[in-house]
Each structure stands twice: as structure tokens, then as C-alpha cells.
Amino acid sequence: MKYLVLGLIATSLVTLTACTDKKETTPIGTNTPTEMIQEKPAEAVDFTELLGHYDHMTFALSSDNVEETAKAATGMLAALQKIEGAHFDAEQKNTYQDIAANIKENAEHIEDNIGDIAHQREHFVEISTDIYDLVQLFDISKPYYKVFCPMVNGGEGAFWLSSAKDFRNPYMGEKMLSCGSIQEELN
């Protein structure tokens, strides 16, 4: 019995000593450096060039200038290509790709229809919706104003974005240059 008690005490001491050993162990598969598993934060995407061409298009349409409108469309297409490589998070990337595809399609129509300002203006309605979505979804530092003209689209009206409170109507051009009202201030 004496040996049994001594054996139990010895076993207990060995067990206690083994349990207090502060050896650091790393489970299998978790030795990846922290920097590698952290997601890279999405960087602010610079839409300055794209928005500059949109402003150019707005001014050209308000001046009834089909050639300058087409040049602005060409500039928008080039700006879209530069943005493609930007760092977006997964949700932003999907949203941006949808918006960019719409802008591209409509800018190509505007670019290809130099002699038809009515057709250019029809596609400008769509581009304005997409630019509005971009300004809403992404951090755009420049203020914009959503301006509505009730006279467009057979009386349905349409909006565009203006970078200034003193806007020029791209839908009516020289006929009704100041037609419209600011509905919303963005940023």
C-alpha cells in the first residue's frame, strides 16, 4: 500500500509539472503571418477624371455642341479603363462593374452619334443616372447638385448632376438654358 501511495504521488507530481510547462504550441495550419490573412482595406478610388468628362459633356450638351459632347464621351471611356484596375472591396467591385458597363454602353452611343444631339441627350439621361449612383455609393469629395428638368422625355422629366449651383440645362440647351431646379445636394 505504501508503494501504491508513493506511486500515485509521483504520478501526480509528473502530471502537475507537465501541465505547468509553458511551452507555446501552434496548431497546424495557423502559422500564417497575420498580415497575410488580413484583408487589404479598399483604397479611395479617384473618379475625378470620369466626373470631369461628365461635366464637360453636360456643358457641351447645354451649348448644343455635338462634337464636344462626343469628345467628352471618348474621355469618359478612357477614364473608365483607368478605373478598372482600382482597388474595390467585393461589394464595391460588383456595383462599379454594373455602373461602368452602363456608362460605357451609353458613352459609345453618344460618341457614335455626332450628328444627332437628340440621340446623345437620350443616352445622357442614362449616364446621369449612373453618375448619380457613383456619387452616392463612393466617397466623392467634390459637391454635386441633382438638378431636375420637367420638360424632358415628353413631360416626364429627367435629372442631371451639376458641379455648380448655377447650372446650365444639358437637355434643353440654348432653348431653355436655365430650366430646372436643384432637388438634392450631394456630399
Descriptions of predicted regions:
Residues 15-18:
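C-terminal motif of bacterial Sec signal peptides marking the signal peptidase cleavage site
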Residues 43-187:
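Mature extracytoplasmic or organellar-lumen-exposed domains after removal of signal/transit peptides
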